[in-house]
Amino acid sequence: MTVLIHVLGSDIPHHNRTVLRFFNDALAATSEHAREFMVVGKDDGLSDSCPALSVQFFPGKKSLAEAVIAKAKANRQQRFFFHGQFNPTLWLALLSGGIKPSQFFWHIWGADLYELSSGLRYKLFYPLRRLAQKRVGCVFATRGDLSFFVKTHPKVRGELLYFPTRMDPSLNTMANDRQREGKMTILVGNSGDRSNEHVAALRAVHQQFGDTVKVVVPMGYPPNNEAYIEEVRQAGLELFSEENLQVLSEKLEFDAYLALLRQCDLGYFIFARQQGIGTLCLLIQAGIPCVLNRENPFWQDMTEQHLPVLFTTDDLNEDIVREAQRQLASVDKNTIAFFSPNYLQGWQRALAIAAGEVA
């Protein structure tokens, strides 16, 4: 049987590193279909840190896409597992027959599915991508993204799968000893990416709570983002006093980020799509409820796991937040499907489906 090849078709270092390390540590030892990767980006020590994997790096999306298409045409039994996909050439290859549906298996990361960019180039490309998505052999996604996808692609097979968030399961039972009274601390957004709509989110928080809460905005990733960070900081200072606004411009190491999250009382995310599942997982693990846009279908996954969900359209106050905290504290976090190690079973099944080992 031909070994499955995994494709990370866009240079998104943080996510790509997470996926590679997860495969190296959790999957490669038990499945030959979890070892071969083609990745856009620089090695930056990844090969050394993932010795169980065979990783081929490419300088750009186009060079990777050309290599994938060549392999697909040379051997029609070759199957590919595409993790996220910001790569137009690959979509066009699927649409034109360069890659066959039986060769194309796709793990939706959220942003790949939604059509939120307003640029002309994107608006012209979206209809073509939509047509190509009808030809995918099987999609893997969160419950919410599957329900979104099936509305326009009802004939494509869909399977539940969660991004492998880096988590320490031993923290599931750790009580959050933060004092749950007095001034609340609210985390706004999951990164410095503009998709977080930071300014609109800060205005929404201010409209709900005024200048009575402390707001923390993590913007250390992606790099080279100083102008936008300053724009967000200035907008925040028009709404909140300096002592109540903390805009973080430096990238935090994992343990430092975890410590930051555990100082919060609430996460506030206004983006109208599924994203930031890693931050959501870490907040929930720490007993911190989250406010979501009702257009973000991940609320379906949360309610399926009996987790409290607050919405940006709700009338929020401290009593409501504290009640959500109490509800979250009563949940057995070891049973949550999108937590580690529970998502591992979904990945093992996804590998078997993509490799053709199970129907």
From Swiss-Prot:
A GO cellular component annotation in the UniProt record: plasma membrane
Molecular function via GO: 4-acetamido-4,6-dideoxy-D-galactose transferase activity; fucosyltransferase activity
Keyword field contains Cell membrane: yes
Its EC number(s): 2.4.1.325
Localization of this protein: Cell inner membrane
InterPro entries documented for this protein: WecF
Domain of life: Bacteria
The keyword GTP-binding is assigned to this record: no
Catalysed reaction, written as an equation: beta-D-ManNAcA-(1->4)-alpha-D-GlcNAc-di-trans,octa-cis-undecaprenyl diphosphate + dTDP-4-acetamido-4,6-dideoxy-alpha-D-galactose = alpha-D-FucNAc4-(1->4)-beta-D-ManNAcA-(1->4)-D-GlcNAc-undecaprenyl diphosphate + dTDP + H(+)
Key words, A-Z: Cell inner membrane, Cell membrane, Glycosyltransferase, Membrane, Transferase
Stated family: Belongs to the glycosyltransferase 56 family.
Protein name: TDP-N-acetylfucosamine:lipid II N-acetylfucosaminyltransferase
Natural source organism: Escherichia coli O9:H4 (strain HS)
